[in-house]
């Protein structure tokens, strides 16, 4: 009789894998602070071109970027060197990212390693189908314009590959720091934004609660959403829920300090066993009012934490903040003129004709090339025609600038400036202006206002 051995299946725990990837010196420091805060639910990886910096990292998973490219000496503030180093170590980066469902890439923009390597790592993550979130800092103003331009270029490169991007200008640290704040404590404040964002996501999936969220909910809010903001607030005592929510939605460190109009919002309200239903409702409604977008995808979760007895913590991730911001067209040298759209064409031309060498833009310019030579000579001589001395006539427009010099202007403007306007500066019909000849509907009294040589032409 054959014996059948039946083994119990292995207890396989299926849960999303979240990786925090620190790049460069600033990214490595952020990971060190998160490890020191004992953040649970995430794996940590640091990557740097500086071998000495890697030695001091608390993280176990380390990548020496570009061994042949930099020889462990850093990128020298050159983003192209940082990018080349990351490309050299692409296989190692890919190995650490595999099996991850979500990755937070943190770096400081403006240097060499973070600015150049972060976009390469983000590209690899996207190729692996990983939900990718970038959390980066921008330089202080005292670091100079060159470093700021480098940072802006790096942010543009990174944004191509991340689903959501959070930018923290270091200059905003002055909003919350005082004269006693140490340099290390100030940077830790910036790192806390990343810490709070990762904790807000992991708590929703691993902490017990009445309303738990799965990874699909997280992905629905953060996938391909562009610029975002994160905020966390804690409060106790009276109105603690509302106060915590208001603190979460007004993070002074972020580049985008308002979540108004966000397309996706992730809300996590955490408290002790004393948290009430009305408090959860007050906090959630306060955030919804701030978003002020009826079409926003708002995903809400609430969890319990015994350590927060008497305290309510509200974490918010608002995404798609810049979805409706389309760059407006601004004409060249538009600051030189201040013309409203309601002004008539005559007013526009007179204002623009006094702007010196500023270009003149009009809706319709006649095709003077179609005129005969005689007509062109007649039209060209209009600026030499004498003006009437009647008091009710508009004075000739001055075509001299402040220096007394005659600026260069188009033929159309010179011609228009020499013509006299009637009826409260109303523009005459263009067919009378172009060739200077009245039509059959012209009144007999108006003929005397036409120069004699034109009157003969008409006769």
From Swiss-Prot:
The keyword Protease does not apply. InterPro entries: Cell_div_FtsZ, Cell_div_FtsZ_CS, FtsZ/CetZ, FtsZ_C, Tub_FtsZ_C, Tubulin/FtsZ-like_C, Tubulin/FtsZ_2-layer-sand-dom, Tubulin/FtsZ_GTPase_sf. It comes from the Bacteria. GO terms for cellular component: cell division site; cytoplasm. It is found in: Cytoplasm. GO terms for biological process: division septum assembly; FtsZ-dependent cytokinesis; protein polymerization. Pfam families: FtsZ_C, Tubulin. Residues 383-405, 427-459 are annotated as: Disordered. Gene3D superfamilies: Tubulin/FtsZ, C-terminal domain, Tubulin/FtsZ, GTPase domain. GO terms for molecular function: GTP binding; GTPase activity. The keyword Cell inner membrane does not apply. Keywords: Cell cycle, Cell division, Cytoplasm, GTP-binding, Nucleotide-binding, Septation. GTP binds at residues 25-29, 112-114, 143, 147, 191. Belongs to the FtsZ family. NCBIfam families: ftsZ. Essential cell division protein that forms a contractile ring structure (Z ring) at the future cell division site. The regulation of the ring assembly controls the timing and the location of cell division. One of the functions of the FtsZ ring is to recruit other cell division proteins to the septum to produce a new cell wall between the dividing cells. Binds GTP and shows GTPase activity. Homodimer. Polymerizes to form a dynamic ring structure in a strictly GTP-dependent manner. Interacts directly with several other division proteins. This is Cell division protein FtsZ.
């Amino acid at each position: 009789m054959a014996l059948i051995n039946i083994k119990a299946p292995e207890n396989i725990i299926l849960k999303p894998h979240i990786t925090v990837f620190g790049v460069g010196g600033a990214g490595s420091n952020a990971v060190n602070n998160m490890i020191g805060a004992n953040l649970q639910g995430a794996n940590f990886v640091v990557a740097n071109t500086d071998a000495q910096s890697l030695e001091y990292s608390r993280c176990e998973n380390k990548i020496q970027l570009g061994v042949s490219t930099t020889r462990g000496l850093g990128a020298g503030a050159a983003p192209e060197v940082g990018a080349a180093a990351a490309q050299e170590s692409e296989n190692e980066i890919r190995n650490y990212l595999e099996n991850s469902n979500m990755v937070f890439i943190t770096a400081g923009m403006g240097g060499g390693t973070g600015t150049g390597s972060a976009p390469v790592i983000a590209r690899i993550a996207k190729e692996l189908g990983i939900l990718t979130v970038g959390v980066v800092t921008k330089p202080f103003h005292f670091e100079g314009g060159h470093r700021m331009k480098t940072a802006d270029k790096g942010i543009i490169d990174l944004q191509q590959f991340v689903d959501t991007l959070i930018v923290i200008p270091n200059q905003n640290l002055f909003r919350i720091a005082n004269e006693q704040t140490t340099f290390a404590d100030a940077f830790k404040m910036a790192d806390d934004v990343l810490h709070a964002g990762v904790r807000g996501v992991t708590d929703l999936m691993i902490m017990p609660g009445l309303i738990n969220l799965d990874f699909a909910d997280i992905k629905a809010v953060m996938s391909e959403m562009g610029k975002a903001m994160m905020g966390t607030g804690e409060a106790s005592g009276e109105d603690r829920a509302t106060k915590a929510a208001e603190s979460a939605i007004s993070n002074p460190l972020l580049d985008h300090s308002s979540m108004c109009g966000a397309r996706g919002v992730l809300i996590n309200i955490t408290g002790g066993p004393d948290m009430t239903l009305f408090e959860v409702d007050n906090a959630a409604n306060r955030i919804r009012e701030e978003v002020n977008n009826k079409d926003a995808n708002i995903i809400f979760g609430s969890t319990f934490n015994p350590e927060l007895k008497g305290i309510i913590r509200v974490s918010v991730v608002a995404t798609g903040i810049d979805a409706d911001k389309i760059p407006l067209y601004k004409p060249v040298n538009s600051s030189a003129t201040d013309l409203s759209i309601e002004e008539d064409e005559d007013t526009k031309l007179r204002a623009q004709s006094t702007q010196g060498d500023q270009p003149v833009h009009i809706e319709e310019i006649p095709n003077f090339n179609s005129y005969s030579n005689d007509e062109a000579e007649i039209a060209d001589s209009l600026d030499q025609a004498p003006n009437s001395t009647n008091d009710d006539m508009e004075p000739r427009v001055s075509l001299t600038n402040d220096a007394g010099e005659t600026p260069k202007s188009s033929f159309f403007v010179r011609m228009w400036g020499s013509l006299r306007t009637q009826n409260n500066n109303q523009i005459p019909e263009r067919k009378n202006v172009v060739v200077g000849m009245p039509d059959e509907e012209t009144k007999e009294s108006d003929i005397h206002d036409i120069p004699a040589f034109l009157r003969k032409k008409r006769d």
